[in-house]
Swiss-Prot record:
This is Phosphopantetheine adenylyltransferase. Reversibly transfers an adenylyl group from ATP to 4'-phosphopantetheine, yielding dephospho-CoA (dPCoA) and pyrophosphate. It is found in: Cytoplasm. The keyword Ion transport does not apply. One of its GO terms (biological process) is coenzyme A biosynthetic process. It comes from the Bacteria. GO terms for cellular component: cytoplasm. It comes from Actinobacillus pleuropneumoniae serotype 7 (strain AP76). It is an enzyme of class 2 (transferase).
Length: 158
């Protein structure tokens, strides 16, 4: 069976850890929709359109991956795209309790939506968008942490 799954996040900015999860999900599932979320409670570094374009560029080598910007409930977005499951990255024990509650909530809201947890490769386990933003704001080199498209976009912001 060829399933559609959704990997959602704000991706502000997209990191190599995100790309690792997307690449691995693309090997496991027929179609991966990267749902780039508009989160009104956050002040993003990049606009929704920019973040969606950066995910698209970073995933151009993956034929079964598409990036779509969205706002609203993820469970509703999943229904609209007939997704069978959500893919979530789990970096460590700090993430597990929150992610399990979120998975249960999305399942309840959608009627039936499973969540598949993928730990990132050991290389990227410590990495987060927040860390990348902090390094960037302090003029640090983020080249090893982000896809090339993101690095170019960050340099254009300087």
């Amino acid at each position: 069976m060829s399933y559609t799954v959704i990997y959602a996040g704000t991706f502000d900015p997209m990191t190599n850890g995100h790309l690792d999860i997307i690449e691995r999900a693309s090997e496991l599932f027929g179609q991966v929709i990267v749902a780039v979320a508009k989160n009104p409670s956050k002040q993003p570094l990049f606009s929704l359109e920019e973040r969606t374009a950066l995910v698209r560029q970073s995933c151009a080598h993956l034929a079964n991956v598409q990036a779509v910007g969205f706002s609203g409930l993820l469970a509703d977005f999943a229904k609209q795209h007939q997704a069978k499951a959500l893919v979530r990255g789990i970096r460590g024990s700090d993430d597990i309790e929150y992610e399990i509650r979120l998975a249960q909530l999305n399942d309840k809201l959608s009627g039936r939506l499973d969540t598949v947890f993928l730990p990132p490769s050991v290389t990227w386990r410590y990495l987060s968008s927040t860390m990348v933003r902090e390094i960037y704001r302090h003029q640090g080199d983020v080249a090893q942490f982000v896809p090339n498209a993101v690095l170019c976009a960050l340099k254009e912001k300087e």
